[in-house]
Amino acid sequence: MRYSISIPQTDVDGFDGEGLRSYLTRAEELGFEGGWTLEQVIGPTPLIAPMELLAWAAACTTTLRLGVAVMITSLHDPLQLAATVTAVDRLSHGRLDLGVAPGGGRRKFEAFGVDPATFISSFTEGLQLMKAAWSDEPRVTFHGRFRDVDDLPISPKPVQRPHPPIWFGANAPRAIARAVRHGDAFMGAGSSTTQDFATAVQILRTELAEQDKDPNAFRIGKRVYLIVDDDAARARERVLAGLRRIYGSMPGVDAVPVAGTPDDVARGLREVIDAGAQTLLLNPLGAGLEEDREQMERLAAEVIPQLD
């Protein structure tokens, strides 16, 4: 098993650079493999943009892998995003993990000039163009439905070859098939229940076999929202308050977190592992950086040892 931790992104009362630097270096000391952000451009809580924060985090760390799960890449220009990904991978000396998804549901595509009728096709084509930009070819030619590029010089290239690992977020069977076709790994959403994740993993494994992909080379992870508290009822209240800050009143979200005493949380995480997770992205939902730091310490000392 591999364990990663979320990187706090909330920026309400001002950015606490020293506090976050201490959090990141402590995550390395505690042995977490990675630190991950998420993307939410429009939402009820102000969050620092993920890639920019990862670039800052790269300067604060030396071994921690740096990830985002997930970027809604259909909302971004692919060449600009490819350049940003390259920059963060180079600044971190090859430590970036890139999570992608086309979006859907309540996404306000029109605000970004994206056609809701074609966003999935545009997403897939955009990912193909990004891979072309990251390739060893010094000049890129690409002709698609949405974009035309002729003999365009693109440099530099990412440190990781052929590109940073691409993690897909997906729930529907067709989306999972797309993840296997175009991705390197799968990250179950924090907003999905353990049972929904288990179902997705079964579909994923079937797709890996049907597409003749090596299941040992396709890593499976899940973001898990959680709170550890000696009072189980208080833990539940705290984790639900955290979910409201991220998702507002999204239906069904109350069923997704793991909360309670250290034993309760270990039990809930064991269920996620049994469902197929090889990487756990542990996402405390404290009310601020200090609470998230305390949660990280408790996870490392009281929960993870029960899982190993």
Predicted regions and their residues:
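Active-site-adjacent structural elements that line small-molecule/cofactor binding pockets in enzymes
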Residues: 1-308
